[in-house]
């Protein structure tokens, strides 16, 4: 167990550092692209892959340079009881103790962008890191001042003990209910019977 925890922490730190390097490189490249674009006629993003990739890079760069910060506190990992045998859910961990940090911004449409890193205890009570980029389309319900609701996606990379901590790409949906600086945010991980089909959620505080 001591070896597993040491290895997990080492690999988690490596994943977080390398991801930060990737984000920084992407942000730097995108900033150069933005400088070039500003000296020419503004481009319009169509449906072609190069424009989408350039738009993604620009969003990463703007988020990386944003002065705003977020903290994440994982609160629940719920295994869908309709897709699991009871003997499995009885022994699975559903309290994902952990912590995370991110940088965020709201764009001109009030949509949320974030670059984040989080580590928590998975269903088998093993350390699991995750890093990625998140986007949510935000909606303000009626005249409820301070409240926001959002739905979107995250493009992330995780690593798990049962897969020997090999980095795994993990695109997932995102949702949130927010009031002022506090949010309840989560994702649903799809899967098959006795695998996946997990609701994972956390509290998010911005400053």
Curated annotation (Swiss-Prot):
Catalyzed reactions per annotation: a lipid A + a 1,2-diacyl-sn-glycero-3-phosphocholine = a hepta-acyl lipid A + a 2-acyl-sn-glycero-3-phosphocholine; a lipid IVA + a 1,2-diacyl-sn-glycero-3-phosphocholine = a lipid IVB + a 2-acyl-sn-glycero-3-phosphocholine; a lipid IIA + a 1,2-diacyl-sn-glycero-3-phosphocholine = a lipid IIB + a 2-acyl-sn-glycero-3-phosphocholine
EC number of this enzyme: 2.3.1.251
Site (described: Role in lipopolysaccharide recognition): 88
Keyword Signal annotated: yes
Record's note on what induces expression: Induced during magnesium-deficient conditions.
Alphabetized UniProt keyword annotations: Acyltransferase, Cell outer membrane, Membrane, Signal, Transferase
GO CC annotation: cell outer membrane
Gene Ontology biological-process entries: lipid A biosynthetic process
MF GO annotations: O-palmitoyltransferase activity
Family statement drawn from the similarity comment of this UniProt entry: Belongs to the lipid A palmitoyltransferase family.
Name under which the protein is recorded: Lipid A acyltransferase PagP
Organism per entry: Photorhabdus laumondii subsp. laumondii (strain DSM 15139 / CIP 105565 / TT01) (Photorhabdus luminescens subsp. laumondii)
């Amino acid at each position: 167990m001591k070896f597993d925890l040491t290895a997990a922490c080492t690999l988690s730190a490596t994943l977080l550092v390398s991801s930060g390097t990737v984000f920084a490189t992407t942000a730097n490249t995108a900033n150069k692209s933005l400088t070039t674009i500003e000296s020419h006629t503004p481009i319009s993003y169509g449906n072609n892959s190069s424009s989408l990739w350039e738009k993604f890079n620009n969003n990463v760069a703007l988020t990386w340079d944003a002065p705003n910060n977020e903290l994440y506190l994982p609160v629940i990992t719920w295994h869908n009881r309709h897709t699991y045998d009871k003997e499995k859910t009885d022994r699975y961990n559903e309290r994902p103790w952990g912590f995370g940090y991110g940088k965020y911004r709201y764009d001109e449409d009030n949509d949320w962008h974030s670059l984040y890193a989080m580590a928590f205890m998975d269903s088998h009570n093993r350390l699991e890191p995750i890093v990625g980029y998140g986007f949510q389309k935000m909606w303000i319900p009626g005249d409820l001042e301070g409240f926001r609701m959002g739905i979107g996606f995250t493009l992330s990379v995780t690593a798990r003990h049962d897969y020997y901590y090999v980095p795994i790409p993990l695109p997932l949906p995102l949702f949130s209910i927010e009031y002022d600086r506090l949010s309840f945010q989560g994702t649903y991980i799809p899967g098959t019977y006795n695998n996946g089909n997990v609701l994972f959620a956390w509290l998010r505080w911005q400053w």
